[in-house]
Design a protein with these regions (language model features):
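Signature of N-terminal electron-transfer/Fe-S-associated modules in redox systems
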Residues: 1-130
Length: 130
């Protein structure tokens, strides 16, 4: 099968990569681009461990094809940290021991960032059903 050339913006940087037509964005991030912070949990889009932002929208990377990222802006957990250190969300996760084994944590942080960008002061119901 011929590999396809894709151009995207990943964590603020223009990237060009080759991927198979049926390769998930999760596999592209991890295997082609070396961005291993995004993890696979369930592989069916139910758990959110593989959450990324695509043009600011929360997406499960396991459900998106890599070729679909062409011309889009992708943000992963690696792109969330401030240049001078941790993003405030990452700091709060650490300070409040909001961690378990670590597989889901990157996705939780990405999803939390997406929530707070849309709802800066969410109530409990908004958080619960986000």
């Amino acid at each position: 099968m011929a590999r396809l050339q894709v151009e995207s913006t990943i964590n603020g940087e223009a990237k060009e990569f080759l991927c198979d037509a049926d390769q998930s964005m999760l596999d592209v991030l991890r295997d082609e681009l070396g961005l291993t912070g995004t993890k696979e949990g369930c592989g069916t889009g139910d758990c959110g461990a593989c959450s990324i932002l695509v043009d600011g929208r929360l997406v499960c990377a396991c459900l998106m094809l890599g070729v679909e990222s062409g011309g889009k802006s992708i943000e992963t957990i690696e792109g969330i940290a401030d240049k001078d250190g941790l993003h405030p969300l990452q700091r709060q996760f650490l300070e409040n021991a909001a961690l378990q084994c670590g597989i889901c944590t990157p996705g939780f942080i990405v999803a939390s960032k997406a929530l707070l960008e849309i709802h800066p002061d969410p109530d409990e119901e908004t958080i619960r059903y986000w």
